[in-house]
Amino acid sequence: MKITQLTVYPVKSLQGIDVSQSEIHAHGLAWDRRWMLVDAQQRFVTQRQLPALATISVALTSDALVLSHPTVEPISISLEEPKGNLRLVSVWSDHCKALPESEAVSEWLEAALGEPAKGVSLVRFATTFTRAVEDDFLAGGEAHTYFADGYPFLITTTGSLDALNNALVAGGNTPVPMNRFRPNIVVDCDEAWQEDGWATIESGSYQLTLRKPCQRCKITTVDQQTGTIPTQAEPLKTLLALNTQPHLKGAHFGQNATLTAGEGGVIRVGEVVSVTPREA
């Protein structure tokens, strides 16, 4: 099996960046979910509240994070950490320390997205702070992440997407691209749902341990280029019907993972990976 896609999401819930290789760290791929949008109460803001966030594209240069939108000029944000007081921001039930970006970024967001983005600001994860991953599925180990929903890596497979799309078409619906699921790592795999039986995935330089199925939310219904919802409730409705995790409630697609060997290594598109099966 080979890795066919690597995607980094520097800003939570904005567009991702497809890369050919990336450094791999305990907190995720390099720069993944380092930034996040928050409201006036310092609570995280995502496509769940603002689907139009999907219309903001992201680039990384050697010294800047660049945000672009069709209606406004791009804005560049220095990769150097901003000066200023730390804020306490929330992601689900976690409280994290973060550095606020400039007011100019907030003004840019409102100009790009209009009234719904009023009061929204951009913050950067403070690397002096550690956000622990829930320990329920870590088998006694430890892991941490930045502003991801819960885990530093999300792994999906081409075989599972093919199976989902076959089911969508059979139900009279339109197939969806992989970006609906916002994975970090996509593995080429002929058979559907094989990832649900993997314990680890590794190459010579790193090992990822698959911890739990990823329960999906309504962001999967949002077109990741236009910010619109083409077909109400899909692909969630079809995923629920497929019931790929009969022992769990909800719709699931992909596996959450943590790094268990190879901190600081490099992961590459095209490299062959091996898997070990989960114990029955």
Protein language model features and the residues they cover:
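Metal-cofactor-dependent catalytic cores
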Residues: 1-280
